[in-house]
Amino acid sequence: MRINPTTSGSGVSTLEKKNPGRVVQIIGPVLDVAFPPGKMPNIYNALVVQGRDSVGQPINVACEVQQLLGNNRVRAVAMSATEGLTRGMAVIDTGAPISVPVGGATLGRIFNVLGEPVDNLGPVDTSTTSPIHRSAPAFIQLDTKLSIFETGIKVVDLLAPYRRGGKIGLFGGAGVGKTVLIMELINNIAKAHGGVSVFGGVGERTREGNDLYMEMKESGVINKENIAESKVALVYGQMNEPPGARMRVGLTALTMAEYFRDVNEQDVLLFIDNIFRFVQAGSEVSALLGRMPSAVGYQPTLSTEMGSLQERITSTKEGSITSIQAVYVPADDLTDPAPATTFAHLDATTVLSRGLAAKGIYPAVDPLDSTSTMLQPRIVGEEHYETAQRVKQTLQRYKELQDIIAILGLDELSEEDRLLVARARKIERFLSQPFFVAEVFTGSPGKYVGLAETIRGFQLILSGELDGLPEQAFYLVGTIDEATAKAMNLEMESNLKK
């Protein structure tokens, strides 16, 4: 599938054919607009409301047509605040969907849902734009090769490996480390793979978006001296934005990623933080449009909306989009319709555990709940598969023994089980890892661990060769060699204290 870009500026498409209309009703971010007979806009067309507010300031609000109501009226959702709008204001139909800038000029820049730069660095140096509403690639254009996408994060690469060109979900409640993990992945992929990333901030905190931007400038992912050499484009529609912007900002980010895949023929990483906010915004818009709510108050079109976004994220014969999506889980309930609908589209799930975070084990990835369709011997190889299965079996047995340990203590276990518990605790700690993006908080330098080194480390723990080392030696280290060096340092410190 090739993009057929237009050559207008960013934001709404500026075609010659413009239909005049008038605002007849405003309900929050939803507008009803009347058009002359025979001049009705199409669904998803971009409308622009123009006029002046009560103090004479110009108003220029972009909207998207959602419903045709009859009697020459349409219902549209605003992409920015509707304060100052009044009935009777002039509305222009642009004749096309919202179009955003695409290509290399977007790298290192921050955009809003309309593709307008919001980083005070001036206009985007490109005339190439693309509409945000497009069909998914045809079946014959898809690439079906299976290969692992190495992240340098031990727990991910060993137990729930990511597929190149696949979709990965980061599941977790509030405050367990989803955004930090995403920042680390962007950092590792830019440094280890030299890949281009697009980050879609959908309905998350503005402070986090600002922190991410500053962090990227510090780490060199965004090149301050030469913006063109940056490795990521940022698209933000944060918590304070109207639901229309939060609902469409994911499509804006995806459109930019599709250009890198289809025209530049690159492998792209698309980060969406947070896909739940996309669903939440759709739910708000659905209620404002008067649709009957479905299960737990969600929109009846939940599966359709999710599918239209997710099916465009795929690998073609030109290139691939590997998507990593943070999924907020309401009240830590994985059966909620929003995370449950997301599950159906994913190749791998990385589940973050509040229990592990409470223990101080970061990344707090649950090794037993996290899954991947890639963890098969024919894809990852026998050695990787066997090591991962043995790690999971050891941790599962430790989990089963925890009730007995809590009631009776370790001494009541058999010798075999005591040994298993000791190894499981070492494994649990060795699954932790210092992050590059958390260096300023932890004081520990970040570590990128290759897959072969990860497998070797866990094999040594499982074999019993390291049974004599204290478990704290395995906490927040990179490779197994660092763990043995840390054990020697701990022993020396202990001897000095004596």
Curated annotation (Swiss-Prot):
It catalyses: ATP + H2O + 4 H(+)(in) = ADP + phosphate + 5 H(+)(out). One of its GO terms (molecular function) is ATP hydrolysis activity. Gene3D superfamilies: 2.40.10.170, Bovine Mitochondrial F1-atpase, Atp Synthase Beta Chain, Chain D, domain 3, P-loop containing nucleotide triphosphate hydrolases. ATP binds at residues 172-179. GO terms for biological process: proton motive force-driven mitochondrial ATP synthesis. It is found in: Plastid, Chloroplast thylakoid membrane. It is a peripheral membrane protein. The keyword ATP-binding applies. Pfam families: ATP-synt_ab, ATP-synt_ab_N, ATP-synt_VA_C. It comes from the Eukaryota. SUPFAM superfamilies: C-terminal domain of alpha and beta subunits of F1 ATP synthase, N-terminal domain of alpha and beta subunits of F1 ATP synthase, P-loop containing nucleoside triphosphate hydrolases. PANTHER family: ATP SYNTHASE (PTHR15184), ATP SYNTHASE SUBUNIT BETA, MITOCHONDRIAL (PTHR15184:SF71). Produces ATP from ADP in the presence of a proton gradient across the membrane. The catalytic sites are hosted primarily by the beta subunits. F-type ATPases have 2 components, CF(1) - the catalytic core - and CF(0) - the membrane proton channel. CF(1) has five subunits: alpha(3), beta(3), gamma(1), delta(1), epsilon(1). CF(0) has four main subunits: a(1), b(1), b'(1) and c(9-12). Belongs to the ATPase alpha/beta chains family. This is ATP synthase subunit beta, chloroplastic. It comes from Solanum lycopersicum. The gene is atpB.
